[in-house]
């Protein structure tokens, strides 16, 4: 079973050569890390297990996303990347994983880690196996070319989209991921929370709203983040995935480090209506 790209040619370049150039542009951008990460091939214990990455078009959020990938790549190739994204389309189940096969992008195909996936399904009791949720969803797809650029096809993924973004669902998923990571100590597993921040307010208002959410992220306060999103009109689309990583970070004794916050007005255009982007890592 192969999942074909839905947003190649719109969110990112569809030509492989141009796509690689676009990814390197993201790293060298003045909003980005301004450098290409050097990949280590020495196998050692990974410090940064969990990340927040944005998922807009690369011309808007690529330079911010590059900050998270800089740290991920610098610590070497993971065996498995669990990618949690919000469900923008409203299709499919409340929490759904692509069941098997591979995902294709212009840079090639990446296989699903079916063994880890089925362990998660068994542990969580809330994950459905459902392709419909993923067919047109961009939040996971846009992460793959960044990973493929450095690791080719030498890693596997577990793609999960979350429509019901509640603290209770986040707790179920975090417990399941924690248990699976504990049961597979020889597998190098990282978890990406794919999310943009506040949407379509002027730059100054977006920054103010985002700062309130970022404070909760720094405190690993997942319930506080939920309250900010729900109570203060912060239109943060992937708060469910972020809540999962906040819970996991606390379970693993990690701290939150904000790598970069910017808006689409900073990266590529007008500031009268912008989207906020955040890169964060959770490590020692």
UniProtKB/Swiss-Prot annotation:
Q: Which family does it belong to?
A: Belongs to the MEMO1 family.
Which InterPro entries did the record assign?
A: MEMO1_fam
The record lists the organism as Saccharolobus islandicus (strain Y.G.57.14 / Yellowstone #1) (Sulfolobus islandicus)
From the Swiss-Prot or TrEMBL record, give the protein name: MEMO1 family protein YG5714_2180
Highest taxon of source: Archaea
- Matching HAMAP family: MEMO1
